[in-house]
């Protein structure tokens, strides 16, 4: 038995190792291509450093920012605002979306006002919000909440509405309560839409955060970029953009994506073949 199981186990282990390698290398390929083009452009086209800084200058700036402590200070400040605004947006959007999704008449009544406010970009609120909230964390949190809320709200409402009613009727026919129907049918069915809304909302939350910090904040990655622009330090500007992108990718691939996969699998919303991968 062990002689037969060993080759199978070895094959399975090799496949998992290959999948992990592919999971890392394939998404990295476009970044490598951009890096190569960037290096070739600065080497052969030789634009001014203010127009396109060399890769070495950007890396040197990141090192200097890290050693001086500025990088950690700005990253922590931005992450604090992002997480606070996103958590508020996710919670309120999820609760509101589920409630509206469960009541089609309520959904029809609220749809016009949701479309109205969703069409107004968070940036448009800046002049008024600066008057109300001042410049600082409260302003950034509001803009992030305003961005994340509508994305999660609409995805949650849509996910709930698309759950087939026959599933709900089946649970109720077996004597299930309203809460049991919600827990075993509605939430699992809407879960893929909700999680997609969360991931998308966080991505747009970064944009709202940087916009708020550009307007005015003592610390933060947006503030760092804006200050660098005043001194024509394009190397720090590019460094700030790279840092934002790297943090966003890390959050998505090592936090949000694993949570999404585990949660969806827990509710049995993937095929058995996918579970084995």
Role assignments for model-derived ranges:
Residues 115-151, 158-162:
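Generic hydrophobic transmembrane alpha-helix motif, especially the helices
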Residues 221-259:
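Hydrophobic alpha-helical transmembrane segments of polytopic membrane proteins
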Residues 142, 146, 178-212, 235, ...:
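Transmembrane alpha-helices
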Residues 112, 155-197, 221:
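Short cytoplasmic-facing helical segments at TM-TM junctions of multi-pass membrane proteins
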Residues 84-114:
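Transmembrane-helix boundary motif in ABC transporter permease subunits
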Residues 1-32, 253-277:
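Transmembrane alpha-helical segments of polytopic membrane transport and secretion proteins
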Residues 53-63, 67, 206, 216-229:
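Short hydrophobic, aromatic-rich alpha-helical segments embedded in or entering the lipid bilayer
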Residues 13-20, 44-88:
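Periplasmic/extracellular loop-to-transmembrane helix junction in inner-membrane transport proteins
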């Amino acid at each position: 038995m062990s002689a037969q199981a060993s080759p199978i186990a070895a094959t399975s282990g090799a496949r998992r190792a290959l999948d992990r390698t592919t999971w890392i290398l394939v998404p990295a390929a476009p970044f490598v291509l951009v890096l190569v083009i960037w290096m070739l452009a600065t080497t052969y086209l030789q634009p001014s450093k203010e127009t396109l800084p060399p890769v070495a200058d950007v890396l040197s700036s990141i090192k200097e920012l890290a050693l001086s402590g500025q990088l950690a200070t700005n990253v922590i400040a931005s992450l604090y605002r992002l997480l606070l605004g996103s958590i508020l947006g996710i919670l309120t959007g999820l609760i509101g979306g589920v409630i509206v999704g469960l009541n089609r008449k309520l959904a029809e009544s609220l749809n016009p006002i949701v479309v109205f406010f969703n069409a107004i970009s968070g940036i448009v609120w800046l002049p008024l919000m600066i008057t109300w909230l001042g410049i600082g964390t409260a302003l950034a949190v509001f803009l992030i909440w305003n961005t994340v809320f509508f994305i999660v709200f609409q995805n949650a409402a849509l996910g709930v509405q698309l759950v087939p009613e026959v599933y709900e009727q089946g649970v109720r026919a077996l004597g299930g309560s309203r809460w049991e129907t919600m827990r075993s049918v509605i939430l699992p069915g809407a879960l893929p839409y909700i999680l997609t809304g969360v991931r998308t909302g966080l991505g747009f939350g970064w944009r709202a955060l940087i916009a708020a910090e550009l307007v005015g904040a003592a610390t933060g990655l947006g503030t760092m970029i804006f200050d660098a622009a005043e001194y024509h330090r394009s190397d720090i500007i590019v460094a700030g953009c790279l840092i934002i992108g790297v943090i966003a990718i890390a959050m998505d691939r090592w936090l949000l994506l694993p949570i999404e996969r585990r949660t969806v699998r827990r509710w049995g919303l993937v095929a058995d073949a996918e579970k084995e991968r």
